[in-house]
Amino acid sequence: MESAPPLGGKARSAQGAPVADLAVPLGPMPLHLVVMGVSGCGKTLIGSAVAQVLGLPFIEGDELHPPRNVALMAAGTPLTDADRADWLATIAARLGSAQAAGQGLVVSCSALKRSYRDVLRGSCPGLRLVHLHGSAALLHQRMLARTGHYMPASLLASQLATLEPPAADEDAISVDIGLPPDPVAATVLARLQATAR
């Protein structure tokens, strides 16, 4: 794991390109961050880049789905709340364990509904959220361009229908994905810095 850049140093993305001039750390307490949004929004790409810049571990939430969920999604079957329950509990436990150990953590997780996010916050008070969003056309295009992922583009419509964007009282950072990844990551980092607590 790379260390965070020095105060005022040049932050770099996972690809090594500069993304921000960032003063770190982002506050007195370790950062616990969920990068959320529907499939195709870039949760893994942006989340891993932010984690690398900040010198924090990153967990790909999709890798924590039980095999049954993966099989359902691969077959084009949308997950229900019940299907997601154990998965969300696993992610919540990872966040809670990191917080208890005083270790920051960045996780990618669709977290489509407020009730799902409440589960995560229940195990990790003070959890920060970054909501990546974009047009349905752009999301669909990105899903079609992906290789090696079990989530078919046909499930995008159900995810968009399920999505409950974070409300004002959830204190989420909302970022449009219309720009290339580096500017998106830079925006996330700058807004995390501006709202550090």
Residue positions per predicted region:
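Hydrophobic anchor at the beta1->P-loop junction of P-loop NTPases
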Residues: V35
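Conserved substrate/cofactor phosphate-moiety recognition/catalytic segment
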Residues: S48, Q52-T90
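Small-molecule kinase domains that catalyze NTP-dependent phosphoryl transfer to phosphate-bearing small molecules
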Residues: A145-T187
